[in-house]
């Protein structure tokens, strides 16, 4: 098979992976809808149970005590199992698309923004599947994870698409296997942690309105479908705690590569500046949790701000800002 054919096949498989991920997202959403329906039926039945006193007025049962802030294991639904299977299938197709892309270009498959985005999304999906397999998050959370992944890959396949080909001369170095691979791993993980931080804020807002007796409207009402707020907080923290050392290594490796390519370790190029800003925000997040006890809303907002800096670092700087990294 010709290199061009391999490249086209890899592109087609990525498109297929996006379709499978989208179907998985619908399956996860279906599982959430079925759980919501079961909870509604259970609530109606509980309210309808009345104890009749001896010759007295009806006495309603007291409301049950609130559940503990842990993940509850419910009977698996067919939609949820099917969605998880689809996610695994999409993951396999996604991996194959990247491998074929590498064979077609005769290099590592992360030499441009299109390939970087695909690889980072793959890391996010991989991390999610690992968390589900280890019981750290509920399977139904996949609806909220797959949505940004599908949008992310859709953007990469349309706006950022680049045909398979050789590296630009500036990237033709063994450091691309080290520096960029670390950046991809950290970026995909940070993408997932940012999504979970947003979901935490949604759940926290939902709990607050419910406790205050205030009306709950969309999108805050989506918080009812999410795991408990402390669970989301722990998941976001765990992912960032893993990704931050990897990002630190990526920044250091990039500085070493810069010295080899441009004769200096650091020059405050726009890419370097925003990579450092991103590093500072995530370092501040971890430091605040460890020393000041920042958890919950404060920590979540810092995580969201850091994810925003990462997006600026990757998209805005690479596309709209002229600098030494403009070729990326």
Task: Give the location of each predicted region.
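Polytopic transmembrane helical bundles with strong interfacial aromatic enrichment
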Residues: 1-328
